[in-house]
Amino acid sequence: MIQRIFLFLSLLLQAGQICHGKIQDPTYSDLRYSGDYKRSQLDLWLAVSKKPTPLVVNFHGGGFKVGDKRSFQRNSMLQNNLARGISFASVNYPYIDQVDGDHRKLLEHCAASIKFITKNASKYNIDKNRISVMGNSAGALITCFLGHAQDLGIRSIYPIQQPKGTPLLLPHIRADGPPIIVYNRSGLNDQIHHPRFAIMLKKRCEELGLNCLAYGVEGSGLRTVPKGKDVNDLAMQFFKKSWKSKKNE
């Protein structure tokens, strides 16, 4: 029962972040990136452009047990940047019970979504050399894993609500991996998304000399978002800088 309550609250938190505007319908819905699982699908929002566009790929949260790609339709990152020439994708992936409880298998499967996009980059007018990833909670773990444990050409990473599985992820973080901007909006009472997990990630990056910006709320031990600034806007600036720089600089 407690676990169910947590999952429900996790969805509420996720919804609290993404409900900023009207629903933005995708250009393509339910594109199958793999035949392995029913949930191996993604939605794609393509910016109107004569030149190949950069792409931000989102992975939803939900403790690997719930959640759906459709939650991204109201995200302010999408709402504010699609018309500015940035394309977006939102990915579904198998739940943990569909991979027999094997977290590693689930994480590795998510790489198929990026491979599908890069393989079809010309078809969708995507610049495969300018792909960044973002994700909430469980999705935060996925983004860091794809960027650092896999060689997928990801340019930058935006994990939100870095969760308690972070210690298992840290050995995969590498000095030549993509830079990270992490944001935990929870305070000290949230044991699932405790600020210490974002701090752990930041510390590991510092040890490796990897660029990492970490933000949180007042009293969390993390730097707060500058007054008048939106963290999604800061993340987009971070993405754009990575797209202009040499790989993983």
Placement of each model-derived feature along the sequence:
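C-terminal catalytic histidine-bearing segment of alpha/beta-hydrolase fold enzymes
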Residues: 43, 183-187, 195-202, 206-249
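N-terminal cap/lid segment of alpha/beta-hydrolase-fold proteins
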Residues: 20-50
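Short amphipathic alpha-helix adjacent to the substrate-entry channel of hydrolases
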Residues: 70-89
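Primarily recognizes the serine-hydrolase "nucleophile elbow" in alpha/beta-hydrolase
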Residues: 115-169
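Short beta-strand element of the alpha/beta-hydrolase
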Residues: 53-62
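The feature captures the conserved acid-bearing segment of alpha/beta-hydrolase catalytic domains
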Residues: 156, 161-207
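Serine-hydrolase catalytic-loop signature spanning alpha/beta hydrolases and amidase-signature enzymes
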Residues: 63-66, 88, 116
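Alpha/beta-hydrolase active-site loop
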Residues: 102-121
